[in-house]
């Protein structure tokens, strides 16, 4: 081989070697540089100062990840979130990477959500860490999990301690018959026969804050199977469902009612000291504390039918990830991080700096800590037995049920025909939204 060819081969070898070394060096440098991920997180009640310290901690532990927390109005949140997720599928309209969803929404929202990867949390771990209602509520028809709860909440009895003491009760009775007897004893009427002190706020919809939640609880108590397995049909006119509905409206229709349509909103009347017992969640307790410090009140488990298995009604929120997120895996890692005991405690502590208590812990392992707080004690007792209904179209279904309650309780309509009419409307909607 002549010298010229040797020189060319030598140069080629040097060039090839340089390219190989450069490629290796670039690969090493790129692998050592953290990936840049920007995520948007939609919340609606926890203020920036409550959530931001946890976001800062996650960002410090995961260089390159930037999370923006955006507070949304709770009013119309369901339709706002759904519209954004829907538009993000077909356009460049931005949707949140991470968002809060109600425990009843999964059938409607599932098509726009990213399932929880087993690499982040397995189904087995999930079922051990969270209450049975969370497993049922956040699992889609495809068997995949679509949200992690950062809280647990549900209906409780909020009671005026002074009014109960005056009538000889320390706490509301836990069996249904004794509870109703107490409600009757605690109801007072004026000379014209009208209620001036309600023993129990129940039976209407326009002036009862949680009317549909109470009705759903009655369905559970009466073992009414109101929702089909695929979540596309509601059965509101079965004998058990009708009996539960009629029981609810009977509280304002019977001879000696404990409540009436002419009374103010139950929360307002309770704050005025004129309601002995009402149904509400932990967030209603916070509202009462904000409105007044003059009412000494307690929170008790729901009364139940003693011959049935224990069951209580859950209404709470989970945290999910959008299918169109820029990085679904990183988003889910952050959600799991928020759900860890250390972070839940810190969230609670941050919130408790500005209000009486933080979000009730969602993890089964933290139940004893819930039981230590007088405002969450009842939740700690009921949480293992809570259930709900995955209706999907929560706002629509609840509005139709409120209309039915008003039609029957206040306008004297037939419950059967009224419920048949709204059932047809609801099922037409669910057949599209929950498919």
Positions of the model-derived regions?
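Hinge/lid segment of periplasmic solute-binding proteins
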Residues: 101-154, 180, 195-196, 211-214, ...
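Extracytoplasmic "Venus flytrap"/periplasmic binding protein-like
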Residues: 57, 64-133, 137, 165-174, ...
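Glycine-centered hinge/linker elements that transmit conformational signals in sensory
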Residues: 182-187, 229-260, 291, 302
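C-terminal capping/gating helix-and-loop segments adjacent to ligand/active sites or protein-protein/ligand interfaces
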Residues: 230, 354-360, 374-426, 430
